[in-house]
């Protein structure tokens, strides 16, 4: 019996867990197949055809990039060359109504996405000489296997003057991790202004705000849009390339052609080493041109704004 128990324990340790997708994991093929035919030169209709699938992918990429970059949670002033900050953060983000009309975007999740979406994260910052600051943030998309990884570099153009506000520029790059079949990256410049007010002793209050311009880049691997495909239907001698039917990629989303603008405002409280903060953010995505792959017609589509509320709790050394 003891030998059996040891064997079972070893099996549990050695064997990997079964693959499982949670409700907020992305299934990108849910956006549909952009090709009206099964393959090049074929007249057979494609499976899961969506004439505006490329536009839906672009709209999704820009919206989810806005979700990934929805928080700043720090004023423009830097920590100083010896400073260090460690924070736990939480963003609550409102998702748009699913659909293809103006103000709608479909997030192709495995199940019904949670709305609002929660994005907890850990944020580490280190002060550098000459008013520079280096930071890193790792966040988790709630109810999914996906994470966000952010690297940032901030430079305070002006800070610490009695009668002048603090002004800073922040460069940042965020990448979605743990996703399947597609890549999503957001990179941009953030321009912030704020002013620290002493409340007595080591207690300060700093209101701040700014504008964040973020470019979005996204692409996909070769996708199989026929999710009911059986192996014996793709190995017939009559069509040795049947396995390539109903496969393809979405049109690439290019960084410099897809820029979101985000306005944010917040306040930070410091009492000794304790740091508290709250921030409201609104990301505006503007319009995109959507092409119909069946008719060749194009139309202008308004993307929804993404509203978020974020909080932070940490230690500032």
Predicted regions: what they are:
Residues 1-8:
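Bacterial N-terminal signal peptides that target proteins for export
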Residues 16-18:
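N-terminal signal peptide c-region/cleavage motif recognized by signal peptidases
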Residues 21-64, 77, 92-97, 101-103, ...:
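Outer-membrane beta-barrel transmembrane domain signature
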Residues 21-160:
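Transmembrane beta-barrel domains of Gram-negative outer membranes and organellar outer membranes
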Residues 80-84, 130-132, 147-149, 163-167, ...:
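Outer-envelope beta-barrel architecture signal
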Residues 86, 128-143, 166-175, 275-284:
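Transmembrane beta-strand segments that form the barrel wall of outer-membrane beta-barrel proteins
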Residues 121-123, 150-152, 190-192, 262-264, ...:
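Membrane-embedded beta-strand positions in outer-membrane beta-barrel channels/transporters
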Residues 153, 304-317:
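Outer-membrane beta-barrel "beta-signal"
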